[in-house]
From Swiss-Prot:
It is a multi-pass membrane protein. It comes from Staphylococcus haemolyticus (strain JCSC1435). Its main location: membrane. It comes from the Bacteria. Belongs to the branched chain amino acid transporter family. It is found in: Cell membrane. InterPro entries: Brnchd-chn_aa_trnsp_Livcs. The keyword Lipid biosynthesis does not apply. GO terms for cellular component: plasma membrane. Component of the transport system for branched-chain amino acids (leucine, isoleucine and valine), which is coupled to a proton motive force. Keywords: Amino-acid transport, Cell membrane, Membrane, Transmembrane, Transmembrane helix, Transport. One of its GO terms (molecular function) is L-isoleucine transmembrane transporter activity. One of its GO terms (biological process) is isoleucine transport. This is Putative branched-chain amino acid carrier protein SH1502.
């Protein structure tokens, strides 16, 4: 394993590790009580395992997901990837990284959230993002060699001090409704990891990883695939360490029921409260600055990864516009939305993400399956069409736009996994139908 693989791996870790990933584990630790380990193991399986799988699958075809999805349907490939890149990019996730950074750095330190201060902060924030992203060939070095070490050092400082301060405490009482047994805790942790939706980002980030590996001079498909796997494993191991550590500390922080009820009543995030408390108790006045640095770096690296991904994709399908022009355009859109109407954008984006997430996971699993089993396009088209319909109907019903009792009665609906048994059945049907359809088997291009 060479130096470049480590740099790419740590870059991938930093791109995945946004502010939400910082908040989820302590909250899980606090809620899981005496059943922490089943919960955190399950959380890592879906919260890290699915994104890792998504990155690896992106390296199966030399054209990445574009090539793999074109074999399902060229039109589906374009529509699906445009929706993914826009929703996790300038229309949702990127503006949110800026607003989250502002809320957890400037607001608690300067005690202000005025529109003028937000404007100045986001202007500086996106100028830094633009500088880091304008040259895609340098993005891996800039994140992997500079920002990631800073991010890891600050997180490790908080984790080490947190262990010293809290590891001697007994586990929290936890949420005894959702985490009342080892099996119940495992299923809840599994669902919570699934709901991070990082598997969608994996589809976007896989292009950066493959391009970065190619830029080092690696040309052979098998070597690109192996280095992608190794880089993904480096990122996954780092994420597991941090998730488990933050979760363990959150599990041993004693928070009384009155405080938890008060936070819930005010719609305040318990994970954010635990992090703030951990930082303040461990480092005093400096704690809020340390946490601010961690959040800012986590958000910045994620924003950079998303800007580069969306710009590279659009430059690939609409090459008449340069990569730099796309970078400037998407950064500008993100800057505007971070200052104007972000809540409205989020309210529109979340249902869209909820629709495409099951489709994205189904796509990843079908591509992986086709790598080992002879597969015709119809065998992939049928389950994707079925899951697309189920996902749309499920989101419509869940949001109360039109209540559908048959959707609400589906197995695993309470875990937002109602699509999975249907995907399994639809895939079996797809492979059976394929036996009677005259199509060539899918072959992924390696060279």
């Amino acid at each position: 394993m060479n130096k470049n693989t480590w740099i790419v791996g740590f870059t991938l870790f930093a791109m995945f590790f946004g502010a939400g990933n910082l908040i989820f584990p302590p909250n899980l630790g606090q809620d899981s009580g005496h059943f922490f380990w089943p919960a955190v193991i399950a959380f890592c399986l879906t919260g890290i395992g699915l994104p890792l799988l998504g990155v690896i699958v992106g390296a199966l075809d030399k054209q990445g997901y574009v090539g793999s999805l074109n074999k399902i349907s060229p039109k589906f490939s374009v529509i699906f990837l445009i929706i993914i890149y826009l929703t996790i990019g300038p229309l949702f996730a990127i503006p949110r990284t800026a607003s989250t950074s502002f809320e957890m750095t400037v607001t608690p330190i300067a005690h202000t959230n005025s529109n003028l201060v937000l404007f100045i902060f986001t202007l500086i924030y996106f100028l830094v993002v633009l500088y880091l992203c304008i040259n895609p060939g340098k993005i891996v070095d800039r994140i992997g060699s500079l920002l990631t070490p800073l991010l890891l050092i600050t997180i490790l400082a908080m984790i080490i001090k947190g262990f010293v301060d809290y590891s001697g405490n007994a586990p929290s009482h936890g949420n005894q409704v959702d985490y009342n047994s080892a099996i119940g805790s495992f299923s809840k942790g599994f669902t919570e990891g699934y709901l991070t939706m990082d598997a969608i980002a994996a589809i976007a980030f896989s292009m950066i990883v493959v391009n970065a590996i190619k830029a080092t001079g690696v040309k052979h498909a098998n070597q690109i695939f192996k280095q992608t796997v190794m880089s993904g494993l480096i990122a996954a191991i780092a994420l597991v360490f941090i998730y488990v550590s933050l979760g363990f500390i959150g599990n041993h922080m004693n928070v009384d029921n009155a405080t938890l009820k008060n936070l819930t009543a005010k719609y305040q995030n318990v994970g954010a409260y635990l992090l703030t408390t951990m930082a303040a108790n461990s480092f005093g006045v400096f704690g809020k600055y340390l946490l601010g640095i961690i959040v800012a770096l986590a958000c910045l690296t994620t924003a950079c990864g998303l800007i580069v991904s969306v710009s590279q994709y659009f430059n690939r399908i609409f090459p008449k516009v340069s990569y730099k022009a796309y970078t400037i355009f998407f950064t500008l859109i993100s800057f505007i939305l971070a200052n104007l109407g972000l809540n409205a954008v989020i309210s529109m984006s979340v249902p869209v993400l909820s629709v495409i997430y099951p489709i994205a996971i189904t796509v990843v699993l079908l591509i992986l399956l086709a790598r080992f089993i002879p597969t015709k396009p119809i065998a992939q088209q049928i389950p994707i069409a079925v899951i697309s319909i189920v996902s749309i109907l499920s989101v419509i019903s869940t949001n109360g736009w039109v209540k559908m009792s048959f959707i609400e009665a589906l197995p695993l609906k309470q875990y937002s996994l109602e699509w999975f048994p249907i995907a399994v059945v639809a895939t079996i049907i797809g492979y059976v139908v394929a036996k009677f359809v005259n199509q060539d088997h899918i072959v992924y291009q390696k060279e």
